[in-house]
Amino acid sequence: MLVESLRATTVAGNPEEFFQYLPSTSRSPQPRQWFEGVTDEAVLSLLAPLEPGVEDTRTAEQWRDQLLSLGRTPNGVWGGKLMWNQVSLLLDRAAGLPHRSGADLRSALDEVLGTDITFIHVYRPDVVDQAVSMWRAVQTQVWRDDATPPAPNDGAEYNAEGIAHLARILRDQERGWRDWFAAENLSPLEVSFTDLVADPQATTAKVLLALGLDPDLAPPPPLKRQSDGRSREWAERYRVEATAKGYPV
């Protein structure tokens, strides 16, 4: 939601998940790749089979240059979104750049993006709601909704084990970012997803201020949150099962 709002300003970069694509397929992780190691057919049967892709043969310099070009607005501001599970992909890509100053994440970011980076940490206080949304999305492969609510019969099915698996991943990702910020002595701009949903325009304005840009450029929300009564029902049902079975919440 935030990246769409920032992109709509036309001055805050063109943020996308530039780091999500696997070099072996040129695709983002597919549903089953989120469940590597899972053998429960009740879960796997709800996920689409893997699709072949095309190997990305760009050099590290070509990858970096294209990434910078695509993510930058005419005023020179670049924007992008990095998930913790994509860090290893970024490190592998950056390893091919010449004159590396180090092999760690901070060095990779500095050498790909430059040293003048504003870190914005978007977090969701409730991992259950996030895991339910993601579980529904990996089944339908519909990740955002800009017009209508999810269809009541979109084909997605409830499965507590599937939700629990994603909740563990999401919890570990959040911990990874917080540990990294602390280790690097960084104080990112903290953006709660709850606040973002409640008032997208005000939250975007806060980010624009942090970037030294005009907060009045914050647009009305371009996306509708992908959540509805069915997702809420699943979250409530999962919390009951989590209490009994020790699933993450």
Predicted regions and their residues:
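Glycine-rich, flexible loop/turn motifs
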Residues: 14, 127, 219
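Hydrophobic, Leu/Ile/Phe/Ala-enriched alpha-helical segments that form helix-helix packing faces
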Residues: 6, 10, 67-70, 108-112, ...
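A structural micro-motif
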Residues: 10-12, 117, 186
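PAPS-dependent sulfotransferase catalytic core
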Residues: 1-74, 225-234
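The conserved 3'-phosphoadenosine-5'-phosphosulfate
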Residues: 20-30, 146-164, 179-249
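Membrane-proximal basic amphipathic "stem/tether" segments
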Residues: 36-45, 95-97, 103, 233-249
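PAPS-dependent sulfotransferase catalytic domain
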Residues: 74-179, 188, 201-216
